Every structure is written in C-alpha cells, then in structure tokens.
Amino acid sequence: YATIGPDDIGGVMLSGHSDVVPTRGQHWNSDPYQIKSDDNAFYGRGACDMKGFIACALASVPQMVDLKLKTPIHLAFSYDEEIGCVGVKKLINVMEDFEIKPRIGLIGEPTDMKMIIGHKGKAAFKVILTGSSCHSAYITNGVNAVEYAAELVSFIRKMNLKMQQQPLDNS
C-alpha cells in the first residue's frame, strides 16, 4: 500500500492483485511467463488479469509525483486472489486502521474496456445443522440433520439456477 499526494483527504485507490491462475492443464504455444507483443497487443500470463493494470498504475507513478496532486492516489495491491483472496484480507485489515480511507476505488479487473460499478464476488458461510438422535423404532421422535442439509443444498442449487436465468445488470 502506498499513497502519492496528500494524506489528509480520502482520494482515489487503484487496486489489483499480483497473482495469476495457475497454468496447469492449459496449453500454451510459448512460455506463458515470457511476455510477447504483436501489433500493439501484449500476450502473456496475467496480461489482462491484472498485470497490465498494475503495470500501468506503477508506470504512472513518476507523473503522479511530478503533478503535486491535491487529491491522493492510493496504490493497494494484493496477492493470492486466485486461490481465495488471501492477500486482500491482510490489506483490508491494514486499511481498517487508517483514519482517512480512500473515497473511491478503481479495480483493474478486465471488463472489455467498459466502466462498470461492480464485479463478481463471493460469500462464504459456515452452516451447522444439529439433529436429535432417537431409537430406530421411534424415528418420528428424532431429527435427521442430514435430511435438512440435503434440503438446504437443494434450495441453494435452485436459487443458483434461478439467478443464472435472470438477466444480469451492468455490473
């Protein structure tokens, strides 16, 4: 995390992750970790997700410094996003203690060069279902947690299918 410009107002955060999806099982015609260029396009592992954005942000730092910015630019880069967003958790923990936080964030995820107001996300929950044991002769006196877990999984799958059939918003 770094700030260019004043540190007494929120400013703009440029954020991205520095890792890439592993290449295992992918077929490349050349070394994916060696960048190649062709007709003003660059090819290589992570060129659009998200190393291109990070390279542009870092290459702009000298100009940002020279401009004597009145509104700060915050560079907030994380790691291990592709395997569970490990690095961003630590970044968030650090930023939570800041008295003055960025007012807006620009995340350099690939979006076909369109500005959007959101991007895919993830929510994880831990669910504990507790049953009630009983003798097999009196099963109506018990509660089978596995049956309720199966119903819950079925409900979640139906909701997922319903969401896939709905039109998406612009994010």
Language-model-detected regions and their locations in the chain:
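Midchain, well-structured core segments that form catalytic/ion-binding scaffolds
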Residues: 89, 95-171
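Short, conserved glycine- and acidic-residue-centered signature motifs
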Residues: 43, 49-53, 142-145
